[in-house]
Amino acid sequence: MEKVLFLDSPMKEKPYGSMRIQEKFGFGLMDKKIGEYWVISAHDNGLSKIKNGKYKGETLKDVYLNHRELFANDPHDKFPLLVKINEIQEPCSVQVHPDDAYARKYENDYGKAEFCLWLDVEEGTKIIRGHSAKTKEEFRKAIEEKAWDTLFVRKLVHANEFVYTPAGTVHGIEGKLMMAEVQQSSDVTYRIYDYERKDANGNMRELHIDQAIEVTNIPHVEPDVHPIVTMLEGNEVIEYVNEKYFSVTRYKIQNEIHINNPSYSLCLPLSGNGILDIDGKEYDIQAGIGFIITSHTKRYFIKGNIDLLVSVPK
């Protein structure tokens, strides 16, 4: 009866990446520009493997499919969430994600709603958040005319701020930052604008204008989300979102804390280190190494100095 699953997870080379993820979390350096670290993933495009216990060496995908009792008998046919750390050193594409209905029909995948927490942010960094178009025709016309300055809405961001991005929301990043991301387990992205970058062979990445126009929320609607800050056993607790697909809560642990586990929890230590205690059995935990508290655990105890991001699927 496994109560916690520690994970060994893939890193993704991206044109906007760097070495900072590897440096920040003490991983071995690779001669690659890492833009995404899929900390907790059962998606076919990047599978986490179990590091401990009876399922050691198996993929999270297989364990989820074959041992649903570890995951509160979750009814989703595929593991529902994907947890990442992303590093942006150049503007990333302006993009939009479809909802479940569209993604299932055309991509055989989940749609994508996502939560992003900005960790390290260079001064002056902006995100693209929404657009100015009022109709699909106006949206298409602005794209055809490359009216990027007036079409896209930009906003300055700072460390420890967050955004919740429902499917259909146009978004992008201009500047340099590192972020933690919790999203539906989907790799479907429709690119609208990629800054006309070319790869080593002189080719530009594919754009998906027709699909983007089809799935974008027009006019843009900003979700109404507000964090709830409380104290638990002397530690600050921030519930960022509690939405349709997941909740995301941050525990800034300074000493020790007991945390209830309502079903199963996806845990990403953002910084620091500590001890995880489940029914008297102790495990070392450290920044950057993701783990899952299975539904066989009803409550867990953490001691140390550690900043922990916990997401719970719905």
For the regions a language model picked out, list residue spans one by one.
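Ligand-binding loop in jelly-roll beta-barrel domains
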Residues: P75-K78, E87-P91, Y110, V121-G124, ...
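Short, basic/aromatic beta-hairpin or loop at an interaction surface
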Residues: S132-E145, N261-S271
